[in-house]
Curated annotation (Swiss-Prot):
Name of protein: Uncharacterized HTH-type transcriptional regulator HI_0666.1
Name of one Pfam family that matches: HTH_3
Location of the HTH cro/C1-type domain: 48-102
Key word Transmembrane helix present: no
Signal peptide start and end residues: none
InterPro entries, alphabetized: Cro/C1-type_HTH (IPR001387), Lambda_DNA-bd_dom_sf (IPR010982)
Molecular-function GO terms, alphabetical: DNA binding
Assigned keywords, A-Z: DNA-binding, Transcription, Transcription regulation
Keyword DNA-binding: yes
DNA-binding region: 59-78
Length: 102
């Protein structure tokens, strides 16, 4: 009986360690999520443009992929508030940028 109690206590300790690991991981994920929060629209537009450049996508190619004109893309990259949200969403999605982390 003592052996079973000892084994049970060991299992409980292991579960507590695992629980702490999961909590630590979730906290790190939340911090990372909050760090990626959009607080400045112009900076977000620049980030989208930088992402486009890092992928090696020319404006003309992005225009073909999205159906969004180059002039609208330029406005979006300068100040996304000047462009419809559906357009921002489409371009972000095309570039592989998620607007929702949930």
């Amino acid at each position: 009986m003592d052996n079973l109690s000892a084994q049970l206590e060991n299992q409980i300790d292991e579960l507590k360690k695992l629980q702490k690991s999961v909590i630590t991981y979730e906290q790190a994920q939340r911090q990372q999520l909050y760090a990626g929060k959009i607080t400045d629209l112009k900076a977000f537009g620049k980030m989208l443009n930088d992402k486009r450049k890092s992928l090696g996508i020319e404006l003309s190619m992005l225009e073909l992929q999205t159906g969004v004109s180059i002039s609208t893309l330029n406005r979006l990259f300068q100040d996304p508030s000047q462009v419809r949200f559906t357009t921002v969403f489409l371009v972000a999605q095309t570039l592989g940028v998620s607007l929702c982390a949930i």
